Each structure stands twice: as C-alpha cells, then as structure tokens.
C-alpha cells in the first residue's frame, strides 16, 4: 500500500489534531459534574458511558495523521486502565496539556530531547511527592468513599467496601448482571488463578473477550494433553451429559486443541482449555486445591489414573466458570465443605512450618484462593443500555478500591497533582530541561481546571485558589465548597494518579520528539460501474 509522509511541524500538528479530537470527547466526562458520551454500536443498542478508555476505543478518525495521534492517546488511556483500572480521563487530559505546552515550546525553538529529559525528571519528582503524601487506607469507610467517587455513586462504594471486608484484600470481587432492580451482594465460595484460555476461539462473549461456562464439568490433568484419542472417550460422556467442559492441564496442544476449537466454532460442544497455574510441585499442589474445591480428581499417572479410562465421576463441577485471556475464576465449586476445611488447615500448618519467605507468600496466596471466596455484586437496571453502563462503572470502582488498598490515597479532584507542583522547585535544571519541567508544572493543573469547567466554575480562578490552600484542601466540585478533601471523602488512589501522570508523560515525550510521520495513503473510492447500455447515458427517456 502507498504511504504518505509528513515532516517537522506538519507531522506534529497532524498528530496533535488527532489527540485533541479524542481528548475533547473524553474530557467532558471528568469530575462529579462531568457528562456522559453516547457511543454508537454496529449491532445492538448504543452504549452510554463516562469511562475514558471506552470512549477512546470507539474513536476512529479519517485523516491518517490524526488517526495516528488519536491511537497514541488511546494507548495512554488503555495502559492506565490496565495498571490502575481508573484515571483514564485524567491521563488523557494530562497528555493533551503536556503535548499542547510542549509543541508550543518546540515551535519556539526548544530542543525536543532536552524537553523530554526535563519532563521525565519532573514526573519522577512529582511521583515521589505523591507517594510520600499518600495516606494508607485503613477503614471500611475510606474504601467506600474512594470506590464511591470512582463509580459516581456512594451506595456502590459502600457495597464494594462490604465485599472487600468479607473476602479480604486478596479475595476476588466480580460483577454480574441481575434481572432485578438495584444492587445485591452475594458471597460465594470460589477461586481465581492467573492463567487464561489457550486459544481466543474459546471466547463466548466477544465484546468482553471472556469465555463463560455455566454449570460445567472440570477436567484436571497433571500432564500435557495432545492426542485426541486419549480425550475422546471422556468427551463423548460429557457431550451425552449436555454440559460444557473446562480442561485444566499442563498444556493442551496439537489435535486435542484443534478438536476442541472446531467443535466450539461449530456449536456442537462448548469447552475451554486452560494451562494449570504454577510450575513443578507448586502446579501439582494448586491442581490438588482446585480438585478439592470442585469435587474432582487430578488425572495423573502418579496416582494410577489415565485419560483413556477416566470416567465422568472423576470430573469436578462448579456453578460457573469465567475465563479471560489472563485469568480463570471458578465460582461455587461442588467440593465437600469438610474436605476444603481440611485442605485449608493443612496449608496453614505448612505456612507455620515454612522457613522460606517466598514459600510462605505462595502458600498465603493459595490459602486466600481456597478460603477467601468470591464476592459477586449483582447489578440491575431498567434498560440494557443503563445496565451495561452501571456494570462498567462498578467494575472500574472495584479496581479503584483495590488500587487504594495497595498504595494508599491522596486528595481527589485533581488537587493532589496541583499541590505536588512545589516538588519541581527542588530540581536544579537549566535550559530546555527546565522548560520541560515547567511544561509538567502547567499540565499538573489541567485535571483540576477541567473538573472546575465541567462544574460550571472559572478554571483559572479555582486553580489559583487551590494552589494557595494548605495541602489536602481543595475544591469539592460536587458541593462547590473548598474543604479538607480526605476528611470529606474526596480521595483518589495514588496508584491511579501516578499512573495517569507517568503514562501521559511517556506519550507526550514521544509526540515532542517526532520529526516525521509515515501513514497509509487513503484509498480512493472505486469509480461506479459503467452504464451497461454503452454510450446511451446522455439520452433522456
């Protein structure tokens, strides 16, 4: 395909236009008074959301340079979402501010590489300041406040805090759709481990990239499964029972994998293959944990069991299994409660007797998975559109709460970033590096200004006032009051705030140091087919 090339200022400005198109659509959602964005879908009802990364993913621009600019900012939102689960809009607003200020200085003759070094040093200083001022999350109320802000609903925050209280920091919280109105919290015995589906063809929900199995059988194998003849007798029994199958093995490959995939695509048999978690003896132990949880047996030559002769009675069962590309969650395994208690007691004894910190940590993880269980938040709404939007907000808030517990919280509403700016005064930078640090200083006020703007206030006046208040005090955009934000429950996880800044700065530095952009040349639309009557087109009938 032919390429088109832009250089210098033309290249950078093309990228900036794309960034601005995307950022302008995303930033209207920031803060408690932010608005929603409606996203058209090719199939089904439109989606209404205020989630930055969901909006960013939907934006496709026509101009090739603008398209690349937008894609770079999508990366900021996506990376922040992956790391922290929230802060995607803040990251986009920061990226826009950094690029705008940076390009202004590049156009005025500043050295882009000097600016890049200055930005990186400034971000490092601000990140250290944020981590230094973070307060540990100690109470259920603090978790509720943080999650409530992320979801834009205090009742959701309280429910998430309740769920975390029940399953602990290590426990698993999932969100499901409900047929009834309102929110419900259900605690179910369950387990999650960090291995996803072996092939993307197993996915049953393409939009969420998940494979969901209801009431499945669970086959646990201590070795590789590669030949279909080993698997066939057992598969036939499972198909006769009319249930889906989850296979957890050292690996599933070759004709065994292709047989499962082909049957899934044809719709004759629903299954998912997953690699067993861990390595060596740890893998054996975790497979045994899953066997006890699901009421099955690990099929292994060590215990005299083989796939060819295995019956359906050796399979485990569960109410539901959800598999993503990275992890598997087993909900309500059919294992015997007494056997699970015995296994938990055995692991606790191993923890007490272990001399190795690493082994102890791994045993604690296994204990949390066996004993912690899974909290299920069931969300209901009047329409499918509202239900999707609500479910998405709750999922974001759960990740937000976990981030808060992990690294602590800082004042929300963009205040922590603005009040971290004095950390830049301690940097002894000169020339373009000093200019780079100043670009970061200007950008730090951007999220607060956008929140104020969305709340109908004058951004410059609000930023000036907040910069002169004592640390932690700022604008509560919901009430319009200036107060101690942590005391008022307006807090952000420091992990979210620092990730937003770090990812925004990373992309901004790439923007500034770009000197040429190579893009695909837009293809011209094919000419309409000629008149089959041949040369009669001018006649009027």
Swiss-Prot record:
Detail which positions bind ATP.
29-32, 86-90, 413, 492
Q: Which GO terms describe its cellular component?
A: cytoplasm
Instruction: Tell me the disulfide pairings in this chain.
Output: none
**Reactions it catalyzes:** ATP + H2O + a folded polypeptide = ADP + phosphate + an unfolded polypeptide
Keyword annotations for this protein? ATP-binding, Chaperone, Cytoplasm, Isomerase, Nucleotide-binding
Instruction: List localization entries.
Output: Cytoplasm
Q: Does the keyword Cytoplasm apply?
A: yes
Keyword Nucleotide-binding attributed: yes
Any one GO BP annotation for this protein: protein refolding
Q: Which SUPFAM superfamilies match?
A: GroEL apical domain-like, GroEL equatorial domain-like, GroEL-intermediate domain like
**Broad enzyme group:** isomerase
Q: Which PROSITE patterns is this protein grouped with?
A: CHAPERONINS_CPN60
Which Gene Ontology terms cover its molecular function? ATP binding; ATP-dependent protein folding chaperone; isomerase activity; unfolded protein binding
Task: Give the main location.
Answer: cytoplasm
Pfam families in UniProt: Cpn60_TCP1
Top-level taxon of origin: Bacteria
Parts forming coiled coils: none
| Documented EC number(s) | 5.6.1.7
Write out the similarity annotation: Belongs to the chaperonin (HSP60) family.
Q: What does this protein do?
A: Together with its co-chaperonin GroES, plays an essential role in assisting protein folding. The GroEL-GroES system forms a nano-cage that allows encapsulation of the non-native substrate proteins and provides a physical environment optimized to promote and accelerate protein folding.
> Subunit info?
Forms a cylinder of 14 subunits composed of two heptameric rings stacked back-to-back. Interacts with the co-chaperonin GroES.
Q: Output this protein's name.
A: Chaperonin GroEL 2
